[in-house]
From Swiss-Prot:
Entry GO terms, CC: extracellular region; Golgi membrane; peroxisome
Organism: Mus musculus
Record field: catalytic activity: N(4)-{beta-D-GlcNAc-(1->2)-alpha-D-Man-(1->3)-[beta-D-GlcNAc-(1->2)-alpha-D-Man-(1->6)]-beta-D-Man-(1->4)-beta-D-GlcNAc-(1->4)-beta-D-GlcNAc}-L-asparaginyl-[protein] + UDP-N-acetyl-alpha-D-glucosamine = N(4)-{beta-D-GlcNAc-(1->2)-[beta-D-GlcNAc-(1->4)]-alpha-D-Man-(1->3)-[beta-D-GlcNAc-(1->2)-alpha-D-Man-(1->6)]-beta-D-Man-(1->4)-beta-D-GlcNAc-(1->4)-beta-D-GlcNAc}-L-asparaginyl-[protein] + UDP + H(+); an N(4)-{beta-D-GlcNAc-(1->2)-alpha-D-Man-(1->3)-[alpha-D-Man-(1->6)]-beta-D-Man-(1->4)-beta-D-GlcNAc-(1->4)-beta-D-GlcNAc}-L-asparaginyl-[protein] + UDP-N-acetyl-alpha-D-glucosamine = an N(4)-{beta-D-GlcNAc-(1->2)-[beta-D-GlcNAc-(1->4)]-alpha-D-Man-(1->3)-[alpha-D-Man-(1->6)]-beta-D-Man-(1->4)-beta-D-GlcNAc-(1->4)-beta-D-GlcNAc}-L-asparaginyl-[protein] + UDP + H(+); an N(4)-{beta-D-GlcNAc-(1->2)-alpha-D-Man-(1->3)-[beta-D-GlcNAc-(1->2)-[beta-D-GlcNAc-(1->6)]-alpha-D-Man-(1->6)]-beta-D-Man-(1->4)-beta-D-GlcNAc-(1->4)-beta-D-GlcNAc}-L-asparaginyl-[protein] + UDP-N-acetyl-alpha-D-glucosamine = an N(4)-{beta-D-GlcNAc-(1->2)-[beta-D-GlcNAc-(1->4)]-alpha-D-Man-(1->3)-[beta-D-GlcNAc-(1->2)-[beta-D-GlcNAc-(1->6)]-alpha-D-Man-(1->6)]-beta-D-Man-(1->4)-beta-D-GlcNAc-(1->4)-beta-D-GlcNAc}-L-asparaginyl-[protein] + UDP + H(+); an N(4)-{beta-D-GlcNAc-(1->2)-alpha-D-Man-(1->3)-[beta-D-GlcNAc-(1->2)-alpha-D-Man-(1->6)]-beta-D-Man-(1->4)-beta-D-GlcNAc-(1->4)-[alpha-L-Fuc-(1->6)]-beta-D-GlcNAc}-L-asparaginyl-[protein] + UDP-N-acetyl-alpha-D-glucosamine = N(4)-{beta-D-GlcNAc-(1->2)-[beta-D-GlcNAc-(1->4)]-alpha-D-Man-(1->3)-[beta-D-GlcNAc-(1->2)-alpha-D-Man-(1->6)]-beta-D-Man-(1->4)-beta-D-GlcNAc-(1->4)-[alpha-L-Fuc-(1->6)]-beta-D-GlcNAc}-asparaginyl-[protein] + UDP + H(+)
Top-tier EC class: transferase
Gene name linked to the record: Mgat4a
Species classification: Eukaryota, Metazoa, Chordata, Craniata, Vertebrata
Membrane topology: Single-pass type II membrane protein
Annotated GO MF terms: acetylglucosaminyltransferase activity; alanine-glyoxylate transaminase activity; alpha-1,3-mannosylglycoprotein 4-beta-N-acetylglucosaminyltransferase activity; glycosyltransferase activity; metal ion binding; protein homodimerization activity
E.C. designation(s): 2.4.1.145
Keywords of the record: Coiled coil, Glycoprotein, Glycosyltransferase, Golgi apparatus, Membrane, Metal-binding, Phosphoprotein, Secreted, Signal-anchor, Transferase, Transmembrane, Transmembrane helix
Similarity comment text for this entry: Belongs to the glycosyltransferase 54 family.
Modified residues (Phosphoserine): 474
Protein name: Alpha-1,3-mannosyl-glycoprotein 4-beta-N-acetylglucosaminyltransferase A
Stretches in topological domain Cytoplasmic: 1-6
Activity-regulation annotation: Inhibited by UDP.
């Protein structure tokens, strides 16, 4: 009898374990499918947004055509000879369109009037590839003749060899040869066709070069910022090269990432970039940075490229590209009546840095004649000590003593982790929003890989509603109100605090982390995510 009972018990344990395992497997598979569906939905949403922008662009182009017809009509002055080849319906339509006295909008020809001298000035002189469109990411690589060594082939191998087969179908790499010597251009093309024939025929790799008529006269440029005439010419031409490449790439995909011809990449870089961008699809970012060096690894949304190109063309003679990019952000969000810190906070929401870096600069000999540049990205090999999120613009402060420049401001802007000496009761970390925010959830993570024991203990999460009185909240939430008007909504457990914000508390004016007991260890804050309610 005991044996039978034991057998039954064993069978029950086996069946229970099997059912539990089956349930967990089903739940896990369902969770993975849900995440995959969410990513597909975000990708579709981005494609629709880009399509809407391109429809608007086409409308603008049609308006430009109307203006050209108006000018042509004025020049011919109604000449019967000029109109003899056009149908009556077309003439009637053109008269209706051109009869409106609309103002003329400045175009690329205003900044580069020499382009009007040749109708092919904005058409590639050389164009190799199948013209792939509809991809997620377009990678742009400008290259010019180098006196000592070319790194282009090694760069392309690094980019292509680190792509999975399905990723090779979802991107296009555009090599821009910024030279007008066609013999040299054709020699580069021949070399790339020999080395990457499969990638070119499949549509993954394209090669273009500009016509000589694209470039203005670069011999009499004003020397600025202490740069030599040669360097001013080099950086001016570089700005024009970037613009041509961006104009060519803008209709090929959802995102455009600027690379250089002397870099290497990390494994899984494509998936990392794409997922990071999709996570931020509800945010109004303008630049995602995947390297801290110059213009390497800077990614834009395709609809923003027109603005970027137009801004660069307005000042292409004045400053180098990285300065101009910073000026675009300043113009968009900085208030001249506010201080530099406020401006930096605003720009940090448009220019978001991903860490660790995915691209490393390896070129020693610059494309500028005689220049040696030993530039390397120090974040390329670093372990991930900070996880970056986009948070609402806020003024941050703390009573904690900061260790070696690991400030709270840098953490909130995604530049570095926060590190403070032993917290004591009464210490705080405060995030005061520039404008009240409707918050959905929060996550604060302390400690990191190098110092896992430096975590926040005995610390609470408090929020300050815009209106502490007359809130429509539950009795349970009301009981969490503190004397200073804050509400205690959570606490750190094992170094982590996360939770959902009661919608009745919104909008929120501030978040505060309050230390309620002395700590025996230092504290690192390596992740801050105050997630806004998505509309």
């Amino acid at each position: 009898m005991r044996l039978r009972n034991g057998t039954v018990a064993t069978a029950l344990v086996f069946v229970t374990s099997f059912l539990t395992l089956s349930w967990y497997t089903t739940w896990q598979n369902g969770k993975e499918k849900l995440i995959a569906y969410q990513r597909e939905f975000l990708a579709l949403k981005e494609r629709l947004r880009v399509a809407e922008h391109r429809i608007s662009q086409r409308s603008s182009e049609l308006n430009t055509i109307v203006q050209q017809f108006r000018r042509a009509g004025a020049e011919t002055n109604g000449s019967k000879t000029a109109l003899s080849t056009i149908s009556d319906n077309t003439i009637k339509l053109l008269k209706e369109l051109t009869s409106k006295k609309s103002l003329r909008v400045p175009s690329i020809y205003y900044h580069l009037p020499h382009l009007l001298q040749n109708e092919r000035s904005l058409q590639p002189a050389v164009q190799i590839g199948s013209g792939r469109t509809g991809v997620s990411i377009v990678m742009g690589i400008p290259t010019v003749k180098r006196e000592v060594k070319s790194y282009l082939v090694e760069t392309l191998h690094s980019l292509i060899d680190n792509l999975y087969p399905e990723e090779k179908l979802d991107c296009v790499i555009v090599v821009f040869i910024g030279e007008t010597d066609l013999d040299y251009v054709h020699s580069v093309v021949a070399n790339l066709e020999k080395e990457f024939s499969r990638e070119i025929s499949s549509g993954l790799l394209e090669i273009i070069s500009p016509p000589e008529s694209y470039y203005p006269d670069l011999t009499n440029l004003k020397e600025t910022f202490g740069d030599s005439k040669e360097r001013v010419r080099w950086r001016t031409k570089q700005n024009l090269d970037y613009c041509f490449l961006m104009m060519y790439a803008q209709e090929k995909g959802i995102y455009y990432i600027q690379l250089e011809d002397d870099i290497i990449v990390k494994q899984n870089y494509f998936n990392t970039i794409k997922n990071f961008a999709l996570q931020l699809s509800s945010e109004e970012w303008m630049i995602l940075e995947f390297s801290q060096l110059g213009f390497i690894g800077k990614m834009f949304q395709a609809p923003d490229l027109a603005l970027v190109v137009e801004f660069i063309l307005m000042f292409y003679k004045e400053k180098p590209i990285d300065w101009l990019l910073d000026h675009i952000l300043w113009v968009k969000v900085c208030n001249p009546e506010k201080d530099a810190k406020h401006c930096d906070r605003q720009k940090a929401n448009l220019r978001i840095r991903f860490r660790p870096s995915l691209f490393q600069h390896v070129g020693l000999h610059s494309s500028l004649s005689g220049k040696i540049q030993k530039l390397t990205d120090k974040d390329y090999m670093k372990p991930l000590l900070l996880k970056v999120h986009v948070n609402p613009p806020a003024e941050v402060s703390t009573s904690l003593k900061v260790y070696q420049g690991h400030t709270l401001e840098k953490t909130y802007m995604g530049e570095d982790f926060f590190w403070a000496i032993t917290p004591t009761a009464g210490d705080y970390i405060l995030f005061k929003f520039d404008k009240p925010v409707n918050v959905e959830s929060y996550l604060f993570h302390s400690g990191n890989q190098e110092h896992p024991g430096d975590i926040l203990l005995n610390t609470t999460v408090d929020v300050l509603p815009l209106k502490s009185d007359s809130l429509e909240i539950s009795k349970e939430t009301k009981d969490k109100r503190l004397e200073d008007g804050y509400f205690r909504i959570g606490k750190f457990e094992y170094g982590v605090a996360e939770g959902i914000v009661d919608p009745g508390l919104n909008p929120i004016s501030a978040f505060r982390l309050s230390v309620i007991q002395n700590s025996a260890v230092w504290a690192i804050l390596n992740e801050i995510h105050i997630k806004k309610v998505t509309s």
